[in-house]
Amino acid sequence: MESQSQRGQHETPKRSRFTGMFHKLKTNLVFRSKLAEINGAMGDLGTYIPIVLALTLAKDLDLGTTLIFTGIYNAITGAVYGVPMPVQPMKSIAAVAISSTAEDFGIPEIMAAGICTGGILFVLGISGLMQLVFNIIPLSVVRGIQLSQGLAFAMSAVKYIRKEQNFSKSKSVGDRPWLGLDGLVLALVCVLFIVLVNGDGEEEEEEEEGDGSRGRGRWGSVRKVIANVPSALLIFLLGVVLAFIRKPSIVHDIKFGPSKMKIVRISRKAWRNGFLKGTVPQLPLSVLNSVVAVCKLSYDLFPEKEFSAASVSMTVGLMNMVGCWFGAMPTCHGAGGLAGQYKFGGRSGGCVALLGVAKLVLGLVLGGSLVGILEKFPVGVLGALLLFAGVELAMAARDMNTKGDAFVMLMCTSVSLGSNAAIGFVAGDLLYVVLWMRNYGRAKPSSLPPQSGEHA
């Protein structure tokens, strides 16, 4: 009897750990508001669709396999982190692939670059070095990277709206006509519709109606109804409908069933080119935007959610060390995607988990034939979604309200936009140290930002 009771006592912690884990997963996936979470899931598509489409058209990326794996990534990260953690393409690797010939940088090189980047990020995470990096980077430098990335997204969005795009060559091909199913008027209407529904993105508190405020209360009710309209979801569905109208024969091109998965064969030359041309430029961007900036922005938006930079680095690493072997696009998290999903209503892991299920279903049911629909999706509509994701990310820098903070941030932003995020990061850190040395010993030194680790 004693041995049985002792076994029961030993088993209790196991059950409690399992129960606690199940409760955490359930809590992470619970919708805060069903319609808002569904709407928020659309907030990342302005970045996701153009890059996936470009790689599919230019490099014959397996769209069906990419949808399946990114869908799984979305579902897992949503359950683990409990925030609308995005899954985005690795932009630097994609840019190199699109601008190179298939012989010079094709699918094997793309996957080699993704595996190498993922492997390094996983090692940085599991060793604790990523957490150390996160703790010592000045907050103003993080804000500078976020501001530069947000402005870069917004400028790309304006280009999508104003100019017609050839994604397979990653370039503009002329001015967008005012009228038409992918015209300038349509894009501008989408932008104004989002502003009307979502406003500036601030959470509005409900006002109590007092005596004599019936008119104001009536307008408040109308405004509340408008605010509950799923703007991003409606705009995305409009884009899908317009894609079929622009090319009705898409219906005949649809083939049911998933793509056949196969392991990508990577030669020694592909490993070398993938690492030198893909991993080397991608790694600084992944460390800064996919890990450091994401963790900082997540803390700003969801201070009650705790997860480390090390864990985020490891999830990015695992995603690519698994999926890239099967031809799935190299992916990472991104502060811009998180900002976009938050802008349109994403508040929980259920938001991206739902998006993941949708991707998984599309990948299994339609496979690569979905590319025909994406090819005719109005680019101006994507630009409208991407514009607000970029602006939302850039607005994270609004808390740099002293001259010392703003100076470091804006210098980092300027260098990042003029060159790249890695050089901007080095310039920002160097400037921070120089200013700290200059102000050392002053009775009232000019304000410099706290370390990002103080907020982790």
Curated annotation (Swiss-Prot):
UniProt gene name: MOT1
Record note on disruption phenotype: 90% and 80% reduction in molybdate content in shoots and roots respectively. Reduced growth of roots and shoots under conditions of limited molybdate supply. 9-fold reduction in molybdate content in leaf vacuoles. Decreased nitrate reductase activity due to a reduced molybdate uptake.
Source organism superkingdom: Eukaryota
Protein name: Molybdate transporter 1
GO molecular function: molybdate ion transmembrane transporter activity
Transmembrane segments: 67-87, 110-130, 133-153, 177-197, 225-245, 309-329, 354-374, 377-397, 417-437
Biological role: High affinity molybdate transporter. Unable to transport sulfate.
Location in or out of the cell: Cell membrane; Endomembrane system; Mitochondrion membrane
Biological classification of the source: Eukaryota, Viridiplantae, Streptophyta, Embryophyta, Tracheophyta
Transit peptide recorded as keyword: no
Activity regulation note: Not inhibited by sulfate.
Main subcellular location of this protein, as a coarse class: membrane
Note: The amino-acid substitution Asp-429 to Val observed in cv. Landsberg erecta may decrease the molybdate transport activity. A 54-bp deletion in the promoter of MOT1 is strongly associated with the decreased expression of the gene and the resulting low molybdate content observed in several cultivars.
Topology class, membrane: Multi-pass membrane protein
Family: Belongs to the SLC26A/SulP transporter (TC 2.A.53) family.
Species of the source: Arabidopsis thaliana
Keywords of this entry: Cell membrane, Membrane, Mitochondrion, Molybdenum, Transmembrane, Transmembrane helix, Transport
Tissues in which the protein is found: Strongly expressed in roots. Detected in the vascular tissues of hypocotyls, in petioles and vascular tissues of cotyledons and leaves, in mesophyll cells, stamen, sepals and siliques.
A GO biological-process term: molybdate ion transport
GO CC, one annotated term: plant-type vacuole
